[in-house]
Amino acid sequence: MHDRNIIDIHNVEFKPFDRYGSPVPNMSWHIISYDQISGQGSYVLKMDPGAQTVPHTHMGFEEFFIVEGELIDSDGMVFKKGEFVSFEPGSQHSSFSEIGALIIVFQRGLNHPLEEH
């Protein structure tokens, strides 16, 4: 018997991205295996044009693959379609998408909004 979950990321139901308690404007997600208590797992994140992530600190690794679009990180670095990005534990940032983006996110630990620190 195989325990697996196969999804078509272009044909899933997205829900408002509410990871920090209330929905973040212009962002939605589809949880694949993400556990909101431990911060472990993966999800598909959709950022509409103009979306801005909440500035946050990584407690564990956060890695993502950009399927479509691009992100501009808080330090000005641009992440483009086809790139895989890895943030180490303790790193802090936020990202903005001018044109929108579809991203597969892999997290190994919770993120905390910067205002909590």
Residue ranges of model-derived segments:
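A short, N-terminal "cap"/entry segment at the start of jelly-roll beta-barrel domains
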Residues: 1-38
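Conserved short histidine dyad/triad with adjacent acidic residue
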Residues: 28-58, 88-92
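Glycine- and acidic-residue-biased ligand/ion/polar-headgroup-sensing regions
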Residues: 49, 58-74
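Short acidic-glycine-tyrosine-enriched beta hairpin
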Residues: 73-93
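Ligand-binding loop in jelly-roll beta-barrel domains
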Residues: 89-113
